[in-house]
C-alpha cells in the first residue's frame, strides 16, 4: 500500500509542476487533463501526508517515553502516543478506502427511470411520490434536473418517468437506488381502510457520452407520432413525439415532453445511450465469474430494496436492515442517511476482497 502511496505522491508533485508550466498551459486540452488527474489524487495525497506527519509525531513521543525518567512526563507521553495511535489507525483506514478501485461512472450525471409496478393506480401514485423524492434530493444537492419523459395517469399518478440529474458525483450517490420500491398504505379510494401493498421499479443509469457508446444510424428506426396525455387522448395535432428503436438490441425509447420533434429526439437518444451503456456493462459483469454479490445488492431491477410503510411512518432498506421512522422527511428528499450507509456498506464489501 505504501509503495503505491509514494508513487501517487511523486505523481502529484509532477502534476503540480506540469500544470504550472507555461508550455503546457498553451495546450488547453493537455492542461485540463493534468488538472483533472491532479484533482483526482489530491485527497489521497493530502491524507497520506497527514498520516506521515502523525507517524513522525508518534515516533517522537515513543522516543520520549523510552528516554524520560520523570513519571509525570512519561504519563503525558503515553497519553500522546495513544491519541496519535488512534489518529493513525483512522487515517490508515481512510487511505485503504481511498485506494479502492473507482467506478468509472461515479462522477457522471445520472438518468433515473421510474415505472409503476403491481398495484394499479396506487402504484402509479407511488411512482409519482418517488419521482418527487429524487427531484427534492437533487434540489438539496444543488443539482440540475431535466425531465426527459413522463407518462401520467388520469388521477395524477405516473406510469413512467425518466429524469436526468446533472451534478458532480450524482451517479455515485444514487446508483444503489436501482430495484423494486414497495409502499404499504391505505389508498385514498379505499373506503374500508385496508392497507394495500404496491410497488414501483427504479432503474439508475449513468449518463452516457457519445464517445462511450457507438450507435450507427442504420441501427435505428425512428417513428414520430402525436403526443398523448393522461388516458391516452391526443394533446396536439403535430407529430412531435418520437419513438427510437435500436434494432440490434430491441431497446425502445419514447419521448413526448417537448413540443419540438428535434428536442424529443435528442432526449430519446440520451436515454438510449444510457441504456446501451448500462446493458454493455451488465453483460461484462455477468461474464466475470467471480463477480461479487454485495451486501447492498446486485443491482438487479427485480430485487426488492426498500419498503415505505405509511401507517407506521417507517422506511426500511432491506439490504442494510436499516429502518428510519421519518417517512415524510425521506419522501421530501432527505435521503442522506440511506445514501451514506449504502456507500459505506459497499466500501466495506470491497475492502473484504482486499483482505
UniProtKB/Swiss-Prot annotation:
The keyword Membrane does not apply. Pfam families: PCRF (PF03462), RF-1 (PF00472). GO terms for molecular function: translation release factor activity, codon specific. Keywords: Cytoplasm, Methylation, Protein biosynthesis. The modification N5-methylglutamine is found at residue 233. Gene3D superfamilies: 3.30.160.20, 3.30.70.1660, 6.10.140.1950. It is found in: Cytoplasm. InterPro entries: PCRF, Pep_chain_release_fac_I, Pep_chain_release_fac_I_sf, Prokaryotic/Mito_RF, RF-1. One of its GO terms (cellular component) is cytoplasm. Belongs to the prokaryotic/mitochondrial release factor family. NCBIfam families: prfA, PRK00591.1. This is Peptide chain release factor 1.
Amino acid at each position: 500500500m505504501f509503495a503505491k502511496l509514494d508513487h501517487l505522491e511523486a505523481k502529484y508533485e509532477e502534476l503540480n509542476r506540469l500544470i504550472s508550466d507555461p508550455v503546457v498551459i498553451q495546450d488547453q486540452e493537455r492542461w485540463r487533463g493534468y488538472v483533472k488527474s491532479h484533482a483526482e489524487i489530491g485527497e489521497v495525497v493530502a491524507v497520506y501526508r497527514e498520516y506521515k506527519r502523525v507517524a513522525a509525531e508518534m515516533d517522537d513521543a515513543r522516543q520520549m517515553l523510552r528516554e524520560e525518567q520523570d513519571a509525570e512526563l512519561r504519563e503525558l507521553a503515553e497519553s500522546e502516543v495513544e491519541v496519535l495511535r488512534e489518529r493513525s489507525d483512522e487515517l490508515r483506514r481512510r487511505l485503504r478506502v481511498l485506494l479502492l478501485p473507482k467506478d468509472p461512472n461515479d462522477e457522471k450525471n445520472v438518468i433515473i427511470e421510474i415505472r409503476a409496478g403491481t398495484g394499479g393506480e396506487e402504484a402509479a401514485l407511488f411512482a409519482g411520490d418517488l419521482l418527487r423524492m429524487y427531484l427534492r434530493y437533487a434540489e438539496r444537492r444543488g443539482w440540475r434536473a431535466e425531465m426527459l419523459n413522463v407518462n401520467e395517469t388520469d388521477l395524477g399518478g405516473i406510469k413512467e418517468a425518466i429524469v436526468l440529474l446533472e451534478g458532480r458525483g450524482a451517479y455515485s450517490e444514487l446508483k444503489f437506488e436501482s430495484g423494486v420500491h414497495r409502499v404499504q398504505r391505505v389508498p385514498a379510494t379505499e373506503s374500508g381502510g385496508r392497507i394495500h401493498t404496491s410497488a414501483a421499479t427504479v432503474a439508475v443509469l449513468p449518463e452516457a457520452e457519445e464517445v462511450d457508446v457507438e450507435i450507427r444510424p442504420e441501427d435505428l428506426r425512428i417513428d414520430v407520432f402525436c403526443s398523448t396525455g393522461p388516458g391516452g387522448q391526443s394533446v396536439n395535432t403535430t407529430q412531435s413525439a418520437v419513438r427510437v428503436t435500436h434494432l440490434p438490441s430491441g431497446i425502445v425509447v419514447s419521448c413526448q415532453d417537448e413540443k419540438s420533434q428535434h428536442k424529443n429526439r435528442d432526449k430519446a437518444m440520451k436515454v438510449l445511450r444510457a441504456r446501451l451503456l448500462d446493458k454493455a456493462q451488465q453483460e461484462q459483469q455477468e461474464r466475470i465469474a467471480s463477480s461479487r454479490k454485495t451486501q447492498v445488492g446486485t443491482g438487479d431491477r427485480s430485487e426488492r430494496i426498500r419498503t415505505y410503510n405509511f401507517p407506521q411512518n417507517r422506511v426500511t432498506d432491506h439490504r442494510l436492515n436499516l429502518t428510519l421512522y421519518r417517512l415524510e422527511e425521506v419522501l421530501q428528499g432527505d435521503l442522506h442517511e440511506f445514501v451514506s450507509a449504502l456507500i459505506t456498506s459497499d466500501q466495506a464489501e470491497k475492502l473484504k476482497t482486499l483482505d
